[in-house]
């Protein structure tokens, strides 16, 4: 008989990750595993029992090769001919935290569960502890 974890049995931890000189994709895979709860032996894909992740020094994140200048992010406004594109370089100048959030978001499942799990990612430019009552592991 399969035993499932109840909501009352879930204890979320806080992880602090330093992104200084980290590669975006490699860091995003580590964060995604923690947020989804895949590092836990009680993982089940239909439940949210992942941990919180705080990422600091996000302004020092990097890409390998020429992806920082050449990679394209596409989005659509919803209007005819409304495709917009930007590079990580331009996005990093405006919102440095958005580069990592996009990478993690695209590794999570699409839907309500993915949105809930993405809210467990906290990206800090000027680092302050997001939850003083919880200990950061």
Question: Locations of the language-model features?
Answer:
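Acidic, Ala/Val/Gly-enriched low-complexity intrinsically disordered segments
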Residues: 136-137
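Short, structured helix-loop element that forms part of the nucleotide-activated donor/catalytic region
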Residues: 103
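Charge-dense, helix-prone N-terminal extensions
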Residues: 30, 106, 110-113
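Beta-rich strand-turn-strand
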Residues: 95-100, 110-112
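C-terminal structural segments of small proteins and small subunits
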Residues: 114-119
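Ribosome large-subunit tunnel/peptidyl-transferase-proximal elements
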Residues: 1-78, 83-98
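Conserved small/polar residues in nucleotide/adenosyl-binding loops
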Residues: 127-132
């Amino acid at each position: 008989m399969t035993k499932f974890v109840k909501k009352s049995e879930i204890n979320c931890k806080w992880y602090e990750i330093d992104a200084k000189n980290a590669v975006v994709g490699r860091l995003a895979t580590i964060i995604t595993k923690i947020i989804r709860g895949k590092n836990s032996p009680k993982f089940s894909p239909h439940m949210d029992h992942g941990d919180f992740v705080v990422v600091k020094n996000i302004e020092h994140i990097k890409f390998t090769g020429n992806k920082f200048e050449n990679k394209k992010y596409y989005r659509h406004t919803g209007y005819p001919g409304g495709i917009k594109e930007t590079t990580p370089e331009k996005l990093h100048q405006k919102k440095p935290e958005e580069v990592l959030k996009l990478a993690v978001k695209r590794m999570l499942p699409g839907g309500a569960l993915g949105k809930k799990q993405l809210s467990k990612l906290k990206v800090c430019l000027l680092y302050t502890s997001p939850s003083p009552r919880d200990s950061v592991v």
